[in-house]
Amino acid sequence: MSSKDKKLSKPTSGRTGGIRTLSDLNRRSEPDSDSDSDGPQEYFTGGEKSGMLVQDPTKEPKHDDVDEIFNQARQLGAVEGPLEHPSSSRSFTGTGRLLSGESVPTALQQPEPVIHNIIFWSNGFTVDDGPLRKLDDPENASFLDSIRKSECPKELEPVDKRAPVHVNLMRRDEKCPEKEKLKVSFQGVGRTLGGASSSTASSQSNLTDVAAVQSPLQSLVVDETLPSTSIQLRLADGTRMVAKFNNHHTVNDIRGFIEFSRPGNPNNYTLQVMGFPPKPLTDPSQTIEQAGLASSVVIQKF
């Protein structure tokens, strides 16, 4: 993360249940400070390329590890103010044309910021809409160490290195709510009662045909023991969502996730990785690792 910190304006919203900020940590170290505050404050650390918004809950902290993360983020330059996204330039952009008729190329467009939300619960933490992760899991040690250092974890780094990354840190007292399990309707091979059995080769062919028409989402199971990543999806209808995949999942799995979330919509769309210029994803069998899609932004285009 950039070492240049920007101080932002104080939020105007009142105190909300379950949220406490780093200003409360500061008050505990200042005995003369007034106990009545105007409401919650937020702290943002980062500069042109990265940012971190830090919040802390209203009750006394229960987990030393989480306290350490928030305290170190404050010590490494967290400043008061809400997270603000870099405003887009209002200057004219486009292709110019000289009086002689020659075209003048426009300047390179800066990529949009990639935003990730990390919530610390009483029983672990979540990244965006991903599953609950444990603080004492050795596989999460490197991730949490980066947060302590006010750095962007490697798994959240965007494909386009020019894109700024904003990591929002929040803390809640309650346990992470359980997500509803996905129900998948039965799919398989039927056999007519009393019908003649087919040959082994024909049976294998039928099984292959059924497997080919099954929804890609049925096989989309994220294995927490394998390398995984979060991908931000921007759909053609303006919806933005974050989905977690294993690195061995394919472009076709991403399409299956989109089509399951938007049943009935036409599937004659293309996917492309946000960048300049955008990179089309034309090979549905290509894995996320092969396509370099880890922590990327994928756009749906009709």
From Swiss-Prot:
GO terms for cellular component: cytosol. Pfam families: SEP, UBX. Residues 224-301 form the UBX domain. Residues 1-64, 79-98 are annotated as: Disordered. The keyword 4Fe-4S does not apply. SMART domains: SEP, UBX. Keywords: Ubl conjugation pathway. Disulfide bonds: none annotated. InterPro entries: NSFL1C_SEP_dom_sf, SEP_domain, Ubiquitin-like_domsf, UBX_dom. SUPFAM superfamilies: NSFL1 (p97 ATPase) cofactor p47, SEP domain, Ubiquitin-like. Residues 113-177 form the SEP domain. Interacts with CDC48A. This is Plant UBX domain-containing protein 3. It comes from Arabidopsis thaliana.
